[in-house]
Structures are given as C-alpha cells and as structure tokens.
Amino acid sequence: VQRFLSARKNRKVTIAEIGAEAQPNNRAVLSASEVEKYDPETFADNLALAKERARKGKGCNAIIEWSPHSNIELNSNGSPLRLGSNPEESFVVLAHELIHAQHILAGTSKAYNGGDRYDETSEAGKEELRAVGVGKYEYRKTRQPSENSIRQEHGLPIRKKYKPHGR
C-alpha cells in the first residue's frame, strides 16, 4: 500500500495492490479527521458520506485498487476487449484510476451521481468518458490529463470508448 498526499485540501490517495485477475477500482473514503467530525456509525455510512463529498465540491480521500500486472487490451477499433496481463502497460490502468482519484479529491466526481458506467448518457458513464478522454473530454478540447493523453504520450493505441466490445 502506498499513500500520496494531494496539495489541495490536504487529501490523500492510497494505492492498494490487487491480484492480476481482479478488476481495478477506486473508492471515495473519509479521512481520519472527517471520521472524527462526522462520526459515521458504520463503514457503509463512511462510504455514503465520502461519496457525497466526492461529487459535491468538497472532495475526500481516495483508495485505488490496482494491479501492476494488468492492462486493458483493445481491439483494432480501440474498443476494450478484456483485462490483460501485460505489466508493461499496467501504468495506463493506474493513470485511468488516478484521473478518477483526482476528481474524487476535488469533489467533481460524476461516478456517484447514479447510472450505469457503461451508459455514456448517465453521470457514471460520463465520469468514465472523462477518465478515458473521449468525445468532449478529449485532451485537445479540455487540456485535462486522461487515459488517452497518457496512451498518446507513450505511443500506445488510443481507446475509442469505455464500454467493452460486445457488452
């Protein structure tokens, strides 16, 4: 487990290593001082408060679950196929999750506003498009880092959508 501090709002990102077969993920969590302040009764209450802060401009800490042994395999059209096992491209998955973490820390995440992350019209779907950097979220339009801006910097194929091929 590695921890990194954010210069903004004294927020922290924790990166926890997971197995190569596990799905990468991130989650909003309260800091120790926020737990003391809000005194959630259960961990579920902690997560609910953190999700609200992650999307309502206040921000909170983030935990990233990531494997240094996994990558996203794309087909020739730039559609994701599956979670692969190329550790040389695992940094792209980490970059994607760090983009989400940046939004959680800033309180601008759309991930917790509801909807299916594979539905590009839902708020959760828009958060994924933002992290990937497609459509109106392309780097050339936003100047915000994205999975695709990282892919481009490293000469890797661009991801054209979030939703996996055939889903």
PLM-predicted stretches and their roles:
Residues 1, 21-25, 71-77, 137-143:
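Short, surface-exposed beta-strand/loop "edge" segments at domain boundaries and coil↔beta transitions
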